[in-house]
Amino acid sequence: MFENLSSKIEKALHTLRGKGSITDINVAETVKEVRKALLDADVSYPIAKEFTDKVKAEAMGRNVIQSIEPGQLMVKIVHEKLTELMGSSAVDINIKGNPAVILIAGLQGSGKTTFSAKLAYHLKNKRAKNVMLVAGDIYRPAAISQLQTLGQQIQVPVYTEEGNNNPVKIAHNAIAEARQKGVNVVIVDTAGRLAVDEDMMNEISALKRELQPQETLFVVDSMTGQDAVNTAKAFNDRIDYDGVVLTKLDGDTRGGAALTIRYTVEKPIKFVGVGEKMDALDVFHPDRMANRILGMGDVVSLVERAQEQYDEAEARKIQKKLIHNEYNFEDFLSQIAQIKKMGSMKDLVGMIPGMDKLTKNVEISDDAFKPIEAIIGSMTPYERRNPQCLNGSRKQRIAAGSGRSIQELNRFLKQFDDTRKMMKMVSKGNTKMPIRKRR
């Protein structure tokens, strides 16, 4: 996420490291490089210039405390201004209503239908809401079919009306049914177009006027950069939406849309899509995003994800097994499954401070666990539960079954043993596991 932008800003700020003081010359040099980094990220020139002018004015107006290097001070100032540019703080969606209606708008291909399902999953599992999805795209049968498939996947009902070509009536009927069934939140997916056109704008305007939704969200593909910003402005001018959703952020190396949409349309970014899975949706926190852009990671989000997947009973069971030397390959496989539920490996690594530098030339892939899973999958149930039983002949069979060499198998067994020893030390040193579920 934002790899190009991060590396260029970091390089720009590096020019102040080792300097004894802040001067007009070194600040001007740093600010110039930051501006170039923003322009390369597809940030418009007026916004990039205003941003760097603010950074420069702030830097020249501060006295450097003796214990703080000029480089550190500049990082702090850039972090503050990035956070401010993206909205300062997270803004929640309004789900107060009987039921609350959320209208989803955006161009075709922006990820609107997938986001609708992700939002339903988010509200159902993280906010304990009873949710209904409404298939309001009457022009594309594939969109209705996609929403029904996603609804089944996340176990959320999808309201459809075959033969009804009036999206306003479909939505009204869905809301009436939702009210009867005690549904808390109705999410209305709407038709998109390949480009902004008058018919589309008239339809989405009519839906907003007739439904009076508690929340209208505009969904845009972050990878389209400045085009995303222009489209966001065109929609906002017509329907005055409440917030923006940036999809495909995990594949965006530049970050121009994330940096400038809020400034341009004066509406907050509320959610970001960070993967294909239904739980790959994050509430947008400007300060955390600024951390990631500056290579400082996002430990808070990492801990939150860990807490969501954390099973206290399972953790206590594993802790007990570690103390009694009973930790086995089945337990290891179970923990891998928990890690995979937290998100893509690339995204998780990006949340750890400093890891972006260490893994700069390393290919981070979700396939990293596949060799381990293949090795453990080639063991018998007895072998998975009893690691100490693996003799030469068993190893030969497991290696052949998993398609790995004996050397690779032995390397994994050593890593497993080292991991088990380390976890045992941690477990003995703490009577409680390090992460506890929030109450």
Residue ranges and their predicted role:
Residues 2-19, 288-439:
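Long amphipathic alpha-helical segments used for membrane anchoring, targeting, substrate engagement
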Residues 9-136, 143-164, 171-190:
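Primarily NTPase-proximal linker/entry elements flanking Walker-type ATP/GTP-binding cores
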Residues 16, 42, 78, 107, ...:
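Residue-level signature of catalytic and energy-coupling elements of molecular machines
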Residues 29, 33, 50, 54, ...:
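Amphipathic alpha-helical interaction segments
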Residues 101-103, 132-133, 159, 187, ...:
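Structured core elements
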Residues 110, 139-141, 165-167, 192-196, ...:
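Short, small-residue-enriched loops and turns at beta-alpha junctions
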Residues 171-175, 179, 183, 195, ...:
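Conserved phosphate-handling catalytic cores of large alpha/beta enzymes
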